[in-house]
Design a protein with these regions (language model features):
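Short alpha-helix capping/helix-loop boundary micro-motifs
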Residues: 40-45, 217-220, 255
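C-terminal regulatory/effector modules of DNA-binding transcriptional regulators
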Residues: 189-192, 239
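Pseudouridine synthases involved in rRNA/tRNA modification
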Residues: 1-27, 73-75, 199-206, 213-216, ...
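RNA pseudouridine synthases
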Residues: 1-180, 184-189, 283-297
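Short, surface-exposed secondary-structure edge patches
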Residues: 45-49, 222, 261
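Short flexible coil/turn linkers enriched for glycine and charged/polar residues
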Residues: 81, 135-136, 162, 203, ...
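Short aromatic-glycine motifs in intrinsically disordered, low-complexity regions
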Residues: 192-200
Length: 301
């Protein structure tokens, strides 16, 4: 792959992370260390300072074969038919294997429970996975059993006709009873593991919210996603000054109220069935960890 530098003085690794689609800064550094990146025909160094017009060439190695092992686990299946299964994912469970985390993911559990009854559109690492929720977010996740179901559900996600509603506890109090955050989200310019509200290299992101109950210093809200960007609710709530309680990435660095994870739960999922179009509406009650925080807030108030 060939790229041309455009910003004077930019580091080679930062340039690659910005310009090469799907490449993080750490991944760019690995390519450089493996000798797969050149600058003007010579091996590049990660801290090389580029000049406009510099020719940067890089090679992405063939992906290594990954053997995803089925793992027996207790899956909370709240809806299932021949085309779709909806899982109520507990907090702490990673959805699919990735670098550094190959085992004990939801996909490992799905392979054990459903075997080859999963769509192959997303490849071997993400069989059946139509959309994702964060590791420390609990709640509903639709899984496609075949390629037809996957294609239709993915289309509903794209045209915003699949409805996803989340319950959240956020820091601070809202004056209004409801509102909308319409702010584009993109990769954080200096921390590639984080997202942020940013105008450049971003995508449209819209979150509608309404107050469920106000407590002293905290608010229970309900969020409806119009789009589905990575970390969207967490980023949007932090952006307006109301980070998710327990979110140590976008909010306070130390847990509050004794809970061990962020208070965010995907409680409602609505979609048109991929085969016949009938409406499917699935609910997942608030998990125990969420209810305990609400009880504590009730006593504090």
């Amino acid at each position: 792959m060939t790229l041309y530098a455009d910003i004077p003085g930019e580091r080679l690794d930062a340039f690659l992370a910005r310009q090469a689609q799907g490449l993080t800064r750490s991944a760019a550094q690995r390519l450089i260390e493996e000798g797969l990146v050149s600058r003007n025909g010579k091996p590049g160094k990660k801290n090389d300072k580029l000049s406009p017009g510099d020719l940067v060439e890089y090679t992405i190695p063939e992906p290594k074969e990954v053997d995803i092992l089925p793992t027996e686990m207790a899956l909370d299946i709240v809806y299932e038919d021949d085309d779709v299964v909806v899982i109520n994912k507990p907090k702490g469970l990673v959805v699919h294997p990735a670098a550094g985390h190959q085992d004990d993911t939801l996909v490992n559990g799905l392979l054990h429970a459903l075997g080859d009854q999963l769509s192959g559109i997303n490849g071997e690492l993400r069989p059946g996975i139509v959309h994702r929720i964060d590791k420390d977010t609990s709640g509903l996740l639709a899984v496609a059993k075949n390629d037809l179901a996957h294609t239709v559900l993915a289309s509903q996600l794209k045209d915003h006709s699949m409805h996803r509603v989340y319950e959240a506890i956020v820091c601070g109090s809202f004056r209004e009873d409801s509102g909308t955050v319409d702010a584009p989200i993109g990769r954080h310019p200096s921390d590639r593991k984080k997202m942020c509200v940013i105008a450049r290299n971003s995508k449209e992101a819209v979150t509608h919210w309404e107050v469920v109950r106000r407590y002293r210093g905290y608010t229970h809200i309900r969020c409806k996603l119009e789009t589905g960007r990575t970390h969207q609710i967490r980023v949007h709530m932090a952006h307006i000054g109301h980070p998710i309680l327990g979110d140590t990435v976008y909010g306070h660095k130390k847990p509050e109220l004794g809970q061990d994870s962020q208070c965010l739960h995907a409680g409602t999922l609505c979609f048109a069935h991929p085969r016949d179009g009938r409406p499917v509406m699935v609910f997942a009650p608030l998990p125990e960890y969420f209810q305990k925080v609400l009880e504590k807030l009730e006593k504090m108030s």
